[in-house]
Each structure stands twice: as structure tokens, then as C-alpha cells.
């Protein structure tokens, strides 16, 4: 986020305004498709054999149940998600969503991501703000389609557009 903040300050110093779009993904870590993640780890990052099987073992076989006073729910097996509060969870999410940057960059929009915190931003002159909004809107539509194809969901109600400068 410091890099984004610095870019916004530099743009303001040069007399430009910046549109900053803060993306909110609904239950981001809970929707990571294990098979798709493992396929990406293999094809995009070159993980093979023992290392790939280790990740497969880490992701599979997880379950949970709720115990409350004298009541216990049935066991539910987890077929997708990465553990959010683990050391690996945010990193695996970054690997899973790395291709989103390619989608965003097709629209010449700056993109910064840390785990499930994603920011899109552009700088422009004040008289060019409407074209920036149009480009961001087209970029968000494409990003939303990519997310849907990858079992993720952009929460439009919590996604925010801010102007700075």
C-alpha cells in the first residue's frame, strides 16, 4: 500500500488527479478452487512431484464441525479455500489470483495486490476524469468476469472508487 500511496502523491505533485478503486472480494480465501490452484502451481510456477503433492496434501482432507454446549454438528469436508490465518494461505491466494494482473494491465490500469487487498488506480488531468471512469469501468467488468471464471466474486457494494489530488 505504501507504493500506491507514493504513486498517488507523485501524481498530485505533478498536478494530476488519481482514481483509486479498492476492490472487495466476497469470502476471497474461502473460494479458492484447490484443483485450479494446484494446476497453476504446476503449470505457471513449475512445481512438480513431491512439492506439488505436499501442497495437495496441505489443501485436501480438511474438515470442520461445530460444537456448542452438548450439541455437535456433522462433519463438513472443505473442497475449496485456503486457510486465511496460516502463513501459506495469503501466499497461495496470491498465486491463485496472479493472472488477474494480466487482465487489469490490458486496460493500462495500475494494479497492486497483497493477498485479497487489491487496488486499481490511474492518474489523469482534471479534464480527463470521465475517460478514466470509463476505462476503470471496462477494466472492472473484465476483472469481474475473470473472477467469476475462477470462483471468486467481486462485491460491488463494498468496492469503492476514491479520487485524490
Residue ranges and their predicted role:
Residues 1-12, 130-150:
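Inter-domain linker/hinge segments that demarcate the starts of reverse transcriptase
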Residues 21-23, 114, 121-123, 157, ...:
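Generic beta-strand/beta-sheet core signal
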Residues 3, 36, 50, 54, ...:
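Acidic, Ser/Thr-rich intrinsically disordered and amphipathic helical segments
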Residues 85, 89:
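Short, conserved phosphate/pyrophosphate- and ester-handling motifs at nucleotide-, phospho-/glycolipid
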Residues 11-13, 90-127:
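Active-site palm subdomain of RNA-directed nucleic acid polymerases
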Residues 1-83, 122:
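Conserved pre-catalytic core of RNA-dependent polymerases
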Residues 16-19, 108, 155-160:
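Short amphipathic alpha-helical interface segments
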Residues 138, 149-165:
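Short, conserved micro-motifs composed of acidic
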